[in-house]
Amino acid sequence: MEDMKASAEKLRAEADYAEQIARSATDVQKRKLYERLAVHFKDLADEIEKVIADNKTE
């Protein structure tokens, strides 16, 4: 379970980093790419956290 928590935390950190890159990007295509990546990383972290929460209730 700890490895899943660590994975979720890492994905959230990656999402934050992707958002930083998106904010500083001058190229529109690059900005949109990193915005999509940030959303994707957050979604993955949410899924992991949902599995963790579901396992706690079992």
Regions found by a protein language model. Give the residues of each.
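Long, non-catalytic architectural segments outside compact domain cores
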Residues: 1-58
